[in-house]
Amino acid sequence: SDDMDYQILIEADFLVNLYEDNESADAIRAVRKNIFRIQSGLKILDDMFNINNG
């Protein structure tokens, strides 16, 4: 769907920007909680930034 495609683009953009801007762990966790919804996006975010949400 268009909504899913848009969400994928948003999450991909955030992944790039969080990395390029060297954001803090707190900022990354906030983006994870408030923006990310797609399972593969969450996994990539967690793997890229070594986020432990367990």
Residue locations for each model-derived region?
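Divalent metal-dependent phosphate-bond-processing catalytic cores, especially two-metal-ion Mg2+/Mn2+ enzymes
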Residues: 1-54
